[in-house]
Structure formats: structure tokens, C-alpha cells
């Protein structure tokens, strides 16, 4: 595996390459004209540099992992097949990423310690995973994405105030949401095609107001008693009509690290299932 560290002083060393494995761009940045022959990066392209505008070489069509971890004001990745677009680090609050309307790859947030960049295009994406976020009480909004043609997962984060998906309408794969922060807003989400695992402690009128169908099994936690009441005070699924598999209401839900199926915790405060009043069919 070849690793090329590209500063302006050594960029001519990779002018003749059409295919390389990993390309790390730091410090002074990248002159894409010097990479005009580049067609494929089989491994990872890492950008940790600043620029007002950066468009990847026109001949580059295939890229396995693209890591963006510092502020480029406008980053154009249109026309490139990328398996994973990963946002990490800080300095992305003023970044705009320009992509195709249908992005077939996966978007992941991994050790993101600043704001999520703005997106242009990206009406549909292949998958979306939100890992650890070091936002120290900040919020994250992903506004453009309307459809995820695969799985969505949000792993446990306790240092985030809110997660907002104002435009998301459909997830065709599995939907996994694990955390204990106070605001999750999916106001336009109507359909989940696969399984839904939802382990959250707070609901409000913007959490899942329009979720109508889950294609396979659905599990969510209702809260439990352990030296006081824990978990959600209210559960809200006002539009849920159909669950294609098993519907499981569990006092304490699973985590990314364990199932929590046989903990012995009980819910002694839930008095009715009025939050499922629109439900018409299960299984």
C-alpha cells in the first residue's frame, strides 16, 4: 500500500500516477491540476487543509474512503463514486460540500468535534452513520437528505443537545437510534423499510410525528423503575399505523454494546397504550 503525503512542495511526485492506495493532504493543500491523470484511489483520501474552493480531478471516478477533517469553504465531489464520505475533526462549520443529488455511498460522522458542514445535492444517500460527536452540548442538523437508501444509525452520545433531520422522509433499511440526549427531531420521516430499534429517553411533538410504517420488527423502550422512574416520561408515535414484524415495548432498550433483554427492570408507571392509538396492523 502506497501512502503519498501531498504538500505543494512534493506534489509533482504523484503527477504520473493513475491509481494509488492512500493520499493524505495536509498543511499547504492540494493543487488538483497536478493530479490530472489520477483515476482511482483504492484506499483513503484524507483532507486536513484549508482552501476556498476545491474540486477533485475530473478523471477521478472511484474513491473508497474520503475523510474531510478541516475547513475547505467549498468542496466539490460531483461525479465521483465514493464508498464512504467521512467527516471528522473540527473547522467544518463554514464548509459546503457539493455532491450529486443521489449519493450512493455512506456518509459517516466519526469523532466530529465541530459543526456538520452544509450539503448541496445529497437528496438521497446510501447509508448514514453518526458515531461519536464531541460537540460539548451543541446541536447537529443534517438538512438536505430526504431519503436514505439503506441503514441509518446513531450511536450513544450524551454531549449533544439536539439532532435534527428536518427533510428526511424515508429510510429503506434499518433504523437504529441509541442515546439519552433530549431532542431528536425527524418531523418528516414517514417510512422505515427494515427494523427499527429506538432507545431514547425523551419524546416531543417533533420526534416522530409522521412515522406511519415500519417494514420489519420495531422495538422501543418505555422506561423503567430503578430508584425512581427512568426513561421517557411520555412515548409519542401519533401516526404509526403498521409494523411489518414484531412490535416490542421494553422497559430498557439495548445499547450498541449489549441487548439488555433480561435485566429484571420493570415499568410501573405506564398506564395505557394511547400513544399507539393510530396503530392498525402488526405482523
Feature-to-residue mapping (PLM):
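A contiguous, well-structured "functional interface" segment within a domain
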Residues: 212
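Concave beta-strand-loop units of leucine-rich repeat
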Residues: 1-11, 17-37, 42-118, 124-141, ...
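Substrate-binding/specificity loop regions of serine endopeptidase catalytic domains
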Residues: 145
Amino acid at each position: 500500500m502506497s501512502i503519498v503525503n501531498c504538500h505543494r512542495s512534493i506534489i509533482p511526485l504523484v503527477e504520473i500516477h493513475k491509481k494509488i492506495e492512500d493520499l493524505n493532504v495536509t498543511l499547504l493543500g492540494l493543487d488538483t491540476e497536478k493530479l490530472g491523470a489520477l483515476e482511482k484511489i483504492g484506499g483513503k483520501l484524507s483532507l486536513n487543509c484549508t482552501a476556498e474552493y476545491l474540486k477533485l480531478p475530473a478523471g477521478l471516478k472511484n474513491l473508497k474512503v474520503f475523510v474531510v477533517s478541516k475547513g475547505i469553504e467549498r468542496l466539490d465531489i460531483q461525479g465521483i463514486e465514493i464508498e464512504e464520505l467521512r467527516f471528522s475533526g473540527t473547522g467544518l462549520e463554514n464548509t459546503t460540500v457539493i455532491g450529486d443529488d443521489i449519493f450512493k455511498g455512506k456518509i459517516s460522522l466519526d469523532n466530529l468535534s465541530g459543526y456538520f458542514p452544509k450539503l448541496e445535492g445529497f437528496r438521497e444517500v446510501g447509508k448514514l452513520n453518526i458515531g461519536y460527536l464531541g460537540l460539548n452540548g451543541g446541536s447537529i442538523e443534517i438538512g438536505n437528505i430526504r431519503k436514505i437508501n439503506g441503514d441509518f444509525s446513531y450511536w450513544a452520545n450524551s454531549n449533544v443537545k439536539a439532532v435534527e433531520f428536518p427533510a428526511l422522509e424515508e429510510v429503506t433499511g434499518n433504523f437504529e437510534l441509541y442515546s439519552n440526549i433530549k431532542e431528536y427531531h425527524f418531523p418528516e420521516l414517514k417510512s422505515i423499510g427494515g427494523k427499527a430499534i429506538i432507545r431514547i429517553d425523551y419524546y416531543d411533538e417533533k420526534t416522530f410525528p409522521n412515522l406511519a410504517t415500519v417494514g420489519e420488527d420495531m422495538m422501543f423502550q418505555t422506561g423503567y423503575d430503578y430508584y425512581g422512574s427512568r426513561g421517557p416520561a411520555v412515548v409519542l408515535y401519533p401516526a404509526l399505523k403498521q409494523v411489518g414484524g414484531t412490535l416490542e415495548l421494553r422497559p430498557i432498550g439495548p445499547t450498541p454494546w449489549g441487548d439488555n433483554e433480561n435485566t429484571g427492570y420493570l415499568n410501573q408507571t405506564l398506564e395505557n397504550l394511547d400513544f399507539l392509538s393510530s396503530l392498525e396492523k402488526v405482523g
